[in-house]
Amino acid sequence: MLPKAARIPHAMTLHGDTRIDNYYWLRDDTRSQPEVLDYLQQENSYGHRVMASQQALQDRILKEIIDRIPQREVSAPYIKNGYRYRHIYEPGCEYAIYQRQSAFSEEWDEWETLLDANKRAAHSEFYSMGGMAITPDNTIMALAEDFLSRRQYGIRFRNLETGNWYPELLDNVEPSFVWANDSWIFYYVRKHPVTLLPYQVWRHAIGTPASQDKLIYEEKDDTYYVSLHKTTSKHYVVIHLASATTSEVRLLDAEMADAEPFVFLPRRKDHEYSLDHYQHRFYLRSNRHGKNFGLYRTRMRDEQQWEELIPPRENIMLEGFTLFTDWLVVEERQRGLTSLRQINRKTREVIGIAFDDPAYVTWIAYNPEPETARLRYGYSSMTTPDTLFELDMDTGERRVLKQTEVPGFYAANYRSEHLWIVARDGVEVPVSLVYHRKHFRKGHNPLLVYGYGSYGASIDADFSFSRLSLLDRGFVYAIVHVRGGGELGQQWYEDGKFLKKKNTFNDYLDACDALLKLGYGSPSLCYAMGGSAGGMLMGVAINQRPELFHGVIAQVPFVDVVTTMLDESIPLTTGEFEEWGNPQDPQYYEYMKSYSPYDNVTAQAYPHLLVTTGLHDSQVQYWEPAKWVAKLRELKTDDHLLLLCTDMDSGHGGKSGRFKSYEGVAMEYAFLVALAQGTLPATPAD
């Protein structure tokens, strides 16, 4: 018997418009009301019964994925402040063990264990280590942990000389924290208790109660997020304040125990900048003269004194930079692909780093020692596992430090492509795709199309060892780099937000049509997948073109756009006004309502649909997908599968652990494979 949620009408009126929400009652901020939990359990039980027929397939896929993970894995060590650091995974362990040794030791000598995350996680269903930081004198470790999956971290401190933990706990914090140079003062960011926005900077002295901590800065504008880091010079603690369109930096002297923050450059609307400091100069990435950012250098805060090192360019986005004593390395993006350039700080000679794959991603890795000439950078493509390189910038010599081992994987068996399709308004949209060479048959393969397209985030064409379980079964996997993402620069992002949000949806649907027309998939075997804001994309796609898809997976989907954006008590809502708009404005209200998936469910046939959520999700509250599924059950006219799977122990990121985290992936893949093979839907067992 299908789950059925009670219909309890709830009227919401704004701008003279009344919306009736029959499933508003599914919202329970306490996550404890029996009727709500009972409905979620009904949906879970139904989903388990439906998928029981595919348990063997799901188990097989999970085993395939886990078999591609080396049982014992050791990271490439790095040296910082006189110590060599690494983390290792031991056979059968879900979490990493973090270790260090003197930089003067040989790597085969004994390592000191800083943290065994397996022991920390032993009594919890969920565990996330958000970050650790060790004092400049190497004696105390700060550790941020989340045991609930709400991204509300607690920070604890351990004396590395005695092994003892200090008594204090800093709770409800962001995993963004910095030690002052005296190794005793600690700066951290606290979250708002209701909205969970990171909004306050506090100063803590080791060994004292958290109640004695001093508030250093509080952000009053609830569209801004607060984060911390230390400059390369170690002279400053940076308080970075950022909304979606504007930023400001305040600095603390890292040498002073009682430092007070000062503004580097006051915020002004639509000016975004970030900075670093090294060798008595500030280096700034700023969009003051162009949307795609330029790089500037100065000794003082006066903006008139900024020296332009790299001008903003129309078709190249400056994404980041890293400072070395003799070199400056920049990370850029052009026509959807990332690239790296090294610039000699004395001669201004520029050297590019070349790559061969048609679709790939590269990034500047962790480089904690600026005095070196050795650059670490990462590389991945849809057919190349993550690879860490070390480049001697003085000589040009390059070596592989580590490539992720994937047992049984042979790159020659797979082919990746980078295409451009033309959307309905004439704009070219990039698509990255990959498939197994031997299994590709033009016009006959199942095609899975992934989309996101929000916040200016770029969905790069990187490697996935779990995805191989689909490719090896004949799936073609495609990523549509729709407007609203950052793949083609700032304008690409702006053309898919606010009152242009529908470009995101149109790009995705037009790309699906084009891929089918080009023969990358069978029209009867087209599947869609997206999560969070990409889940909203899924909701819009099936409202507008349900016949296009055989099956859809919506992961933790943001689908009740108007109601959520009208409720400023919901975590993150106010910070989203500069992404979607504020529906208190009638123009934005009408526009958002016209595409919001929940508000546009109609009596029509929908494709097979698997929806996932986590009870403790802090980014997209569980009741959004729950309400959406309930409304779909009420109105849809087909007999296709509709499954809602709620993880009662996790949040936005799903299960934790390097093996357990793939249980949900295996279920999703089994759902897709079974649909493609015609073994779903099956009559669920009672």
From Swiss-Prot:
Enzyme class at the top of the EC tree: hydrolase
Keyword Hydrolase: yes
Catalysed reactions, semicolon-separated: Hydrolysis of -Arg-|-Xaa- and -Lys-|-Xaa- bonds in oligopeptides, even when P1' residue is proline
One GO CC term, this protein: cytoplasm
One of the record's GO molecular function terms: serine-type endopeptidase activity
PROSITE patterns according to UniProt: PRO_ENDOPEP_SER
EC number: 3.4.21.83
GO BP term, example: proteolysis
Active site: 532 (charge relay system), 617 (charge relay system), 652 (charge relay system)
Pfam families in the record: Peptidase_S9 (PF00326), Peptidase_S9_N (PF02897)
Its biological purpose: Cleaves peptide bonds on the C-terminal side of lysyl and argininyl residues.
Protein name as it appears in the record: Protease 2
Organism of origin: Escherichia coli (strain K12)
Gene: ptrB
